[in-house]
Amino acid sequence: MKVIHLISGGDSGGAKTHVLSLLQNLSRTIEVDMVCFMEGPFAQEARELGISTQVYSDRNVLRTLRLLKQKIREGGYDLIHCHGARGNMMGAFLRKSTGLPVVTTVHSDYRLDYLGRPFSRVTYGTINTLALRRLDYRIGVSDAMVDLLISRGFDPDRLFTIYNGLDFSPRHPAMDRQAYLRSVGLEADDSCVIAGIAARLNPVKDVATLIRGFAKAHAACPQLRLLIAGDGEQLDMLKGLAAELGVAGQVCFAGWVTDTNTFYQSLDINTLTSLSETFPYALTEGARASLPTISSRVGGVPYLIDHGVNGLLFSPGDADELARHLVALAQDATLRHHLGQRLHQKAVEEYALESTVRRQLDIYEIILRRQQRPHHSRDGALVCGAYGRGNAGDDAILEAIVAELRHLDPDLPVWVLSRSPQDTRLKYRVNSIYTFGVPKFLWRMARTRLYINGGGSLMQDVTSHRSLWFYLFTISAAKRLGNQVLMYGCGIGPIHHPSNRKRASRVLQKSVDAITLRDTHSLSELEDMGVTRPEIVLSADPTVILPAAEPEVIDGMLESQGLDPHGRYIGFTLRPWPGFEEKAELFGRAADYAWETYGLTPVFLPIEKRLDVAACKRAAAYMKAPHHIVEDTGASDHTIGLFARMQVVVSMRLHALVFSAGQGVPLVGVVYDQKISSFLSYIGQDLFTDLGELTYERLTGQIDAAVRRIGDVQFLSGGVERLRQVERRNSETAAKLLGLAPPKP
């Protein structure tokens, strides 16, 4: 593989570090050449690192383009990789004339690159904005940068994420801590706790908030000191602010620091106060030194720092919150050690330079593989379901379906019908169309190979006749427009109205190629409706394949809710439904019973926040025992992880039962819909009661029975393991309809 990199050559900061370290390491594996458009320290340093570097400094763009075309034609390159405005402009011109795929790395928000320079913003900024749209692929230097690009309409299928890699090999400071602090002018003895920041002193870095927060924290912790490494236009203002707040003697401005190893080794706390970031090197530098970190919650920072688990986050500009975090760390050396060690471990695993190099090579291989992919008039899959409504169960279904499609064909274009297309694009990195944007999704259907009617209970008329008619319409349209049609891990029924049953039977019989079902009741329902033509396969709910988040992440979530990670809990998931109001008191009293009898703290966990939180509060209003309502359970892996920490789960929601069953938690189901009893029967569990027949005695009796099952691994895991085995039939059926090889175990 041979790649040519195009960059202006005037870059500094994180972009410079990223490009030079990446190219130095890539050149050990593949052929890499770099072209700069100006001579200077960047090009000189690249040569010193052994990177093949050539400078085309001619200001005549057309002449430079001719030279580049000749170099690329004669050099036998496979791919063009651009960086920055000038590189992107050249890449956009070279794309068609060379026939090579062109990718760019977006190092920063291109709309902010020329703030304060109106002429450059109008010229270079406009050119860069246009050029970015003309390139084939884009790489964001953090997940947050990719999110930003998606929000601005860039195709998620043509975006990649890479992080600024760091060499985590052991580093040795040039001098000891006390000597270094004296050398930069900070008076501090061994009892002092040193907080620090390395940043340009400009408005975006918002060091003023750090000084304000430090001054408040210093009043409570006089042993605190602040070391600021960096320079910029705000230096004098910041010095004046420190004096005004009475901490000039405890704040040291060290200027630009070249010996970053010794700087970070001299700190006790690393900080970042930026108003905007992609993914700052300052955090991984601090992580390399195992420093506990306090950072503003911006850009890609939350992808590295899990609040309360391996660091502390605060809202940008909030000096009071920052001060509280500084005080907490200054007063607790053990907490500093634990947070620093956890951050170091995560950074080594995910952000080491070796990982960055491997990721870049993977991206090149993906791009070249896609270039070889046959281009047909039809490609990809369109997925339709109850998505984009904030229901954790439906979101988990989509996550599982997308994961299984990517496993079958990592380059398969995936489109999703969603009530919130923007949220779906950001969350799942897929293209999305508004669910009821009929012209748009019909246009897409004419170009896809597979239409998936997603998992869940879409074929029912209990909640709505119109939703059933809509889903049947999309199935018919997809088949008429030339798609293979798959109903994926779904439930069927109840469909009560005779005309609806007749319509559903006709459409499924005529327009569906295969149906994979999540339970035996759905199989019986299809038989009763006379649906026989499609291939019908008994499988399982797709979400049984999803894992829980790492234990330390769930520990942090529980701690942030004021809950002991090692506590004993009973989970309740409730939803509004006809008849629930009359039974709400029973749930509250049963929760009290679990607390009084077994010492289980009731925790209410919603699946669909906009509906379930109110139902949980309604039941909790009848309680006397201590309890907690988690109003937002987060992403699917977080939600599953929270259910895994329950000793028993009582639920009206199907996916609370599915998530809990997958983690071996004893279950009590309250049946408002046949899907609850169907699932529990399917996995061999018998503790469930119809909502209308629920009594206090029956509910507490089933809680007693569930408590007795705690620790019965064979019973609790047996049915779910069988589900995970048969769930493979979902993706096997999809592979068959797409003409792909079946998935590997």
Describe these PLM feature segments.
Residues C82-N88, V106, R653:
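Short His-centered aromatic/hydrophobic patch
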Residues H307-G308, L312-A319, A328-A333, L687-L694, ...:
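Conserved acidic donor-binding segment of nucleotide-sugar-dependent glycosyltransferases
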Residues W256, L275:
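Aromatic "clamp/platform" in nucleotide-sugar-dependent glycosyltransferases that forms part
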Residues R133-T161, L166-P170, I515-T532:
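A short, active-site helix/loop in glycosyltransferases that binds the activated sugar's phosphate group
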Residues V35-C36, P292-S295, I305, V649-S651, ...:
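Short hydrophobic beta-strand element within catalytic cores of glycosyltransferases
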Residues G13-Q24, V193, I197-A219, E233-G240, ...:
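A conserved mid-protein helix/loop that constitutes part of the nucleotide-sugar donor-binding site
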Residues L62-R66, P101-V103, R111-R134, D147, ...:
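Nucleotide-sugar donor phosphate/pyrophosphate-binding loop at the beta->alpha transition
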Residues R369-P745:
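Active-site anion-handling motifs in enzyme catalytic cores
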